[in-house]
Amino acid sequence: MKNLLKMSDLSPAELIHILDVAGQLKAQQKLGGTAPLLAGKSVALLFSKASTRTRTSFEVGVYQMGGLGNYMNTSELQAGRGEPLKDTARVLGRYYDCVVWRTYRQRDLEEFAELAGVPVINGLTDYAHPCQVLADLMTIREHRGTLAGQKLCFVGDGSSMANSLIAGGLLAGMQVTCVCPESYRPAADVLMFARKYGSQFHLTADPAEGVRDADVVATAVWNTAAPGTPESEQRLRDFVGYQLTGKLLEAAKPDAMVLHCLPAHRGEEISTAVFEQHAPEIFDEAENRLHVQKAVLAILLAGK
């Protein structure tokens, strides 16, 4: 693994190795601290979007492993005044051992990775959110003991979370169902990737069908438009019936897990009651962002 740009870049063995290392680092941290695996290393934390979990978990993770993490908002750099992306990549690659970038376009991230000359980690793009999905898979494995054969259902729009959960779940040997309205499907290349797995993947617009007998049901914000705008109102209409409610989850297994990448819009993609019922899993999931990201850094920079 040279970078972490999207889930489908990983092999099944690489994915499981990340989770194994994450588990080891989590156990070490609970016992008093992680070895200084990043001593003498510097990590650029480059953000073009607002962030709570991604920024803070990377900052804390780099610190816990003895490295230096520098947060930068791209609006405050020369890149925010028109300096070409390729120049920023080649400069930061000379200063830092690794770059984490949270941005909009996946193709910008991939161009950056080609030019930087150091490992690049996707902190979220409009296409992919691999760090979050690694945390999801770690959480499922902690609660269930295994990933292979588990039925994972994602309910929402064809967002970075859908794209990444589909790829990650299939690579981990899970049965994956994606539930979304017809006009909000995942990316075409993700669906092509998923179809290689045959009956292991299912796409439907019917929430009740999708969650039937699921071991894990995941969702994410699907109303990302500003409140009161025409787009927001349209999404509220289009996603009627797609909220995770107690009634909908009756079709899942009685002990089904519920995951949410946060932040949550209670009353839209998930009811308040369901969110609070499954808060222990959801906040385990949030904590595990720290541990999987430490694992990715340790693998890329310390040869773990």
Locations of regions flagged by a protein language model:
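Positively charged, low-complexity intrinsically disordered leader regions
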Residues: 1-56, 60
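Active-site cofactor/substrate anionic-group-binding motifs, chiefly glycine-
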Residues: 42-43, 47-95
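Short, structured coil segments at secondary-structure junctions
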Residues: 65, 95, 115-117, 172, ...
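Adenosine-phosphate binding glycine-rich loop
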Residues: 255-256, 261-304
